[in-house]
């Protein structure tokens, strides 16, 4: 396994070559990876449909309501929670500027005033996780907004592991399997989270049958998963 110094050396060389092509977006992604390696961050990213419960799951992990439970109406709507010694919130704007905020309500106010917020970085002191541990909450993969899709893909490539999160009623959507297949091709470890399993009705279909259908679909698409979680409220069934 390469050391951080070796990784940074390769990344800087790659960045230098990419800069020759004037591909600003790819350079930006490489810069994000460089930052992650330099700061020795372990990053877990939640992606999935709108209203799949990604923010709620992140709040559950921290045991605090850090993120609003409904989507933040920002242009790219990505929230980055990093464990640090001190708390703070930074809004990153599309013009490469940023501003420090006192609370998340100010993000909503900025959007009402038509500020173009690309992402929100939250520094949070947590006794549960080591400093540098980062959780990212991305826009819905089913969004038709180009900047939402761009934001999701950008943070996808800076992740150590990706939690693909879906609502119980939308498990069999082809979009899910197409996206997870892409993650496999990018060599990003994937955990499949089927949320709101409390919607399951045992009188309509047994849980074992539902589970078998999920596993069969994954096999048909030839998708490799690190794990599957069936989540309902604060308890989980795991595979």
Segments from the language model and where they lie:
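Charged, amphipathic alpha-helical linker segments immediately N-terminal to NTP-binding catalytic cores
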Residues: 1-21
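Alpha-helix capping and helix-coil boundary motifs
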Residues: 22-23, 206
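Globular "head" domains of long coiled-coil molecular machines
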Residues: 30, 35-239
């Amino acid at each position: 396994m390469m050391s951080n110094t070796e990784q940074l050396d390769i990344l800087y060389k790659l960045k230098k070559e990419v800069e020759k092509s004037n591909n600003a977006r790819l350079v930006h992604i490489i810069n994000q990876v460089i930052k992650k390696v330099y700061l020795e961050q372990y990053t877990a990213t939640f992606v999935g449909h709108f209203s799949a419960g990604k923010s709620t799951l992140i709040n559950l992990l921290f045991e605090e309501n850090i993120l609003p439970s409904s989507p933040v109406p920002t242009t790219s709507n990505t929230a980055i929670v990093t464990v640090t010694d001190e708390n703070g919130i930074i809004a990153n704007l599309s013009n490469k500027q940023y501003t420090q905020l006192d609370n998340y309500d100010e993000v909503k106010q900025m959007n009402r005033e038509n500020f173009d917020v690309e992402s929100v970085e939250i520094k949070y002191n947590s006794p549960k996780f080591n400093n540098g541990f980062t959780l990212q909450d991305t826009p819905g993969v089913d969004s038709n907004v180009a900047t939402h899709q761009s934001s999701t893909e950008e943070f996808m490539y800076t992740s150590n592991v990706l939690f693909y999160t879906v609502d119980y009623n939308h498990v069999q959507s082809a979009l899910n399997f197409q996206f997870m297949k892409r993650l496999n091709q990018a060599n990003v470890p994937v955990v499949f989270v089927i949320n709101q399993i409390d919607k399951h009705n045992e009188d309509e279909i047994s849980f074992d049958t539902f589970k078998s259908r999920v596993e069969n679909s994954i096999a048909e698409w030839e998708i490799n998963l690190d794990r599957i979680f069936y989540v309902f409220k604060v308890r989980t069934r795991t595979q």
